[in-house]
Structures are given as structure tokens and as C-alpha cells.
Curated annotation (Swiss-Prot):
Stated name of the protein: GTPase Der
CDD domains listed in its UniProt record: EngA1, EngA2
UniProt entry keywords in alphabetical sequence: GTP-binding, Nucleotide-binding, Repeat, Ribosome biogenesis
Organism name: Alcanivorax borkumensis (strain ATCC 700651 / DSM 11573 / NCIMB 13689 / SK2)
Gene: der
Protein origin, superkingdom: Bacteria
Length: 471
């Protein structure tokens, strides 16, 4: 039976785990900066070498403190080690051996699985000298690399894969590039301001402590993708960094995190914007909703921390939401408590419904029949002496559903009539939780630009008709 080995990257913060992750997966999925503690959750990625496949797990650094966020970060790293077939223990060749390295090594030596000591940042220094002091850790397999420049990375992964038999091969004919897990699944991005409960919601939806949750704004720094299956359907949940107002973003790392959050939204198919019920919908929430609407993704709102609120406060939140979302009445709203699980189960049905609507399939004949039904009951308004004529329609794309309507003089259609068409198509197609876009294309007139030469008799008749109309 073939297998795809799982390789876990562990070590102190800022030793280059995310840089190596990006090298091994040939992506830039992991956020990288010269800043300790940047990665705080497990991040998965697939890679291949010579047609052989493997999965890499990036983890948060195992911290030296016993309190604060280092504790859950360490827990995430230990879970990754438990899932892995191979462990790559990374150390900093420039910083040398530290007490934290010794402590981590003592735990890894107890594991009944292959563990390799990877001495990173050996560029510009003598590799043998950099490696020498790390032999004291008692790990027999010691490999030097420079992840930032890619030196030694290929030979390292070749050596590691040699320890496996019956490796899974890339299917014949498939393009040999890295493929992210969950690429063929329903991709759901969870967005919101800092500390509104995004990670708690994802953990509740997954049923495990998968994403680090800490009662401090800005816990999630990178966009974390979690692939899994539910009732035979594949999903990828994407936890993102909280997006604050631009004036409150001071750290460069946080600016990168916001960019990654918006990129995650672009890569998703369904976006769930989480709002804090205690604060109601804020201007920043509306900005986030604006980003989501501009992206054209299926969209829903989860109003979190709903439990424990007074009835009059709940009513104020409902009224305010309805008033401020008048521009997008199709957006579905669910009131939940991520901490206690209230209403979270219903989100799955809403996600599936929104995805099905965003990727609707319909033939040209059926869509044209719908268009004729709409225009026969309510034809386009006359513009001067002429009326626009819609002839046929077809599906131009998905996520969002894009309907292309062909006809004559479509540029003369007023905005109000285009909005009417959008609402009627949404109603007939039963689209829920997704925007819809209409594109209008006018046919070319083969006689446009030619001078219309009339005979004397035609000129006389035309003058007579104009004179009669003036009476």
C-alpha cells in the first residue's frame, strides 16, 4: 500500500520553520518575518520530489515560557508531532545551542519515530563548525541547510524520503506542482475584527482544539487552512488574522497578516464574517463586508456572543443589522455562540446552500426562457423612439454567478431596470447567500456609420409624416 509521509517541523520560535515550509511546498503560504512567534497554529501543505508526494506541517515555536500564549502554541506543536511520520527538529546554526533546544531534544528522543536534527542558517558560516555543538543533543541524523536560500534543502528531503518504501506517486500526466490540501474542497474563509471569536468558531465547527485560542486580540497572525471531511463532503476552513482599522495597524507583521487575510478571502469560495453581538455591526465590519462583496464570494454573517444578552439589546442589534445591510439583502445572518455551540450546526447548511448557489449550472436555453418570461411581463422602458431588446442569455461564470445578456441597445437600459432583472433572476434561480452579476452585450449594427441615402419620393413622404405628427 502506498503512503504519503507526514513531516512535522518543530523547534524554537524564529529558527526558520515557516521558511523551510515554503521551500518544501513551493508556496508562500506561511507568513515569514524576522520575528519570533509568528506562526501560532499548525499549517499543512503538500509537496513532491521526483514525483513522490509528502505532506509538511508547520508549527508554532515551542516557547520557553510556561504562561501566556506559548502554552497553547506548544500544545499545537506536540499535536503535529503526534500526527507525523517524521519529525524535523530545527535549530539556529548562528545562535548556537540553547537550553530550549536541549529541552525539546530530550522530549523528541523519547519518540518512537524518525527524528532529524536540521541545522538552519548555515549560509555564510562553516557548516561543520555550526553543526558540531548540536551533536551533544544525541540525535544521530544531523543535516545542515540554509532554508532562506534553498541550500541543502533538496538533498535533505531526498535523504528523508529514502527511509520510506512504497511512497505515493504523483498521478501520471498530472502537472508536477505543489497542490495545497483542500484544493478540490469547499473553501470557507472566516473573517472578522480581532477577538470576535473566529478561532473559537472554527474549533467548534471542527470539534477539536485545532486553532490556537487565547483571550487576546491578534492571536492569529497567519491564515490557517484546515482541510477535513463532513458527511462525505470535503471542506477547507481558513482562519484569518483579525482586520483592524488602518490607523490602528502599527506592526509590520500585522500589516502582512491583514494582507494574508484579504488574500485568503480571494482564495475562498464562501466567506463567513464574524461580528461581536455585544458591539453590534461597526464601521470596520462594514469595510470587511465591502471587501467580501467586491470579491464576489458567497457571503454570510455570523453574529457571535449572542448568548447572555438582554432581549432589548438583541432587538437593537437585529434592527441595526437590517438597516445597515439594506444594500445587500441577500446576505444570510445567523446568531450564534461559538463558545457554547449554539446555532453553529446550522452554519453548515448555510455554507452548502451558498456554495451550491455560487456554482449553479444552467443551460443557455433555460436561462433564455427565464429572461423572456421576465421581459414579457415587464419589458424594458422605452428610451426616446427606441426600446432595448434582449435576445438571449447564457451563464458566463461562477462564484459569483455571472449572467451574460445579449441584445440590441442594452447600453440604454436604466440602472433601475438592471436591478429589477437581477432581483428577478435571483428569485427564479433560487440563489441564496451569493451575489449575482449581470453583463450586457449589444450586437453590432452592420449598417452603422453608413449614410442612409433616400430617394426623392422617400424624402417627400418623410416630410409629410413629420408635418402630420406636429399637428
Amino acid at each position: 500500500m502506498t503512503m504519503k509521509p507526514v513531516i512535522a517541523l518543530v523547534g524554537r520560535p524564529n529558527v526558520g520553520k515557516s521558511t523551510l515550509f515554503n521551500r518544501l511546498t513551493r508556496t508562500r503560504d506561511a507568513l515569514v518575518a524576522d520575528f519570533p512567534g509568528l506562526t501560532r497554529d499548525r499549517k499543512y501543505g503538500d509537496g513532491q520530489l521526483g514525483g513522490y508526494l509528502y505532506t509538511v506541517v508547520d508549527t508554532g515555536g515551542i516557547g520557553e515560557n510556561d504562561d501566556g500564549i506559548d502554552v497553547p502554541m506548544t500544545s499545537q506543536s506536540l499535536q503535529a508531532v503526534g500526527e507525523a511520520d517524521v519529525v524535523l527538529f530545527m535549530v539556529d546554526g548562528r545562535a548556537g545551542l540553547t537550553a530550549a533546544d536541549e529541552q525539546i531534544a530530550s522530549e523528541l528522543r523519547k519518540l518512537p519515530k524518525p527524528t532529524y536534527l536540521i541545522v538552519n542558517k548555515t549560509d555564510g558560516v562553516d557548516a561543520d563548525s555550526a553543526m558540531s555543538e548540536f551533536f551533544a543533543l544525541g540525535l544521530t541524523e544531523v543535516l545542515p541547510i540554509a532554508a532562506a536560500h534553498g541550500r541543502g534543502v533538496t538533498s535533505m528531503i531526498e535523504h528523508i524520503l529514502e527511509g520510506f518504501t512504497d511512497l505515493e506517486l504523483l498521478p501520471e500526466g498530472e502537472h508536477r506542482t505543489s497542490k495545497k490540501p483542500g484544493e478540490d474542497s469547499i473553501r470557507v474563509a472566516v473573517l472578522g475584527r480581532p477577538n470576535v471569536g473566529k478561532s473559537t468558531l472554527i474549533n467548534r465547527m471542527l470539534g477539536e482544539e485545532r486553532v490556537v485560542v487565547f483571550d487576546h486580540a491578534g492571536t492569529t497572525r497567519d491564515s490557517i487552512e484546515v482541510p477535513f471531511e463532513r458527511m462525505g463532503r470535503a471542506y477547507t476552513l481558513i482562519d484569518t488574522a483579525g482586520v483592524r482599522r488602518r490607523g490602528k495597524v502599527f506592526e509590520m507583521v500585522e500589516k502582512f497578516s491583514v494582507i494574508k487575510a484579504l488574500q485568503a478571502m480571494e482564495a475562498a469560495q464562501v466567506v463567513v464574517v464574524v461580528i461581536d453581538a455585544r458591539e453590534g455591526i461597526t464601521d470596520q465590519d462594514l469595510h470587511l463586508l465591502g471587501y467580501a462583496l467586491d470579491s464576489g464570494r458567497a457571503l454570510m454573517i455570523a453574529v457571535n456572543k449572542w448568548d447572555g444578552l438582554e432581549a432589548d439589546h438583541k432587538e437593537r442589534v437585529r434592527v441595526n443589522l437590517g438597516r445597515r445591510l439594506e444594500f445587500a439583502p441577500w446576505v444570510k445572518i445567523k446568531f450564534i455562540s461559538a463558545l457554547h455551540g449554539t446555532g453553529v450546526g446550522d452554519l453548515w447548511g448555510m455554507v452548502e446552500q451558498a456554495w451550491d448557489s455560487a456554482f449553479i449550472k444552467i443551460g443557455t436555453n433555460e436561462l433564455t426562457r427565464m429572461m423572456e418570461e421576465i421581459t414579457n411581463g415587464h419589458p424594458p422602458p422605452r428610451n426616446g423612439r427606441f426600446r432595448a431588446k434582449l435576445r438571449y442569455a447564457h451563464l458566463g461564470g461562477n462564484n459569483p454567478p455571472t449572467l451574460v445578456l445579449h441584445g440590441n441597445r442594452t447600453e440604454a437600459l436604466p440602472t433601475s431596470y438592471k436591478k429589477f432583472l437581477e432581483n428577478r433572476f435571483r428569485e427564479l434561480l433560487k440563489l441564496e447567500g451569493t451575489p449575482i452579476r449581470l453583463e450586457f452585450k449589444s450586437g453590432t449594427n452592420p449598417y452603422e456609420g453608413r449614410k442612409n441615402v433616400l430617394t426623392d419620393r422617400q424624402v417627400h413622404k418623410r416630410k409629410r409624416m413629420i408635418k402630420r405628427m406636429k399637428k
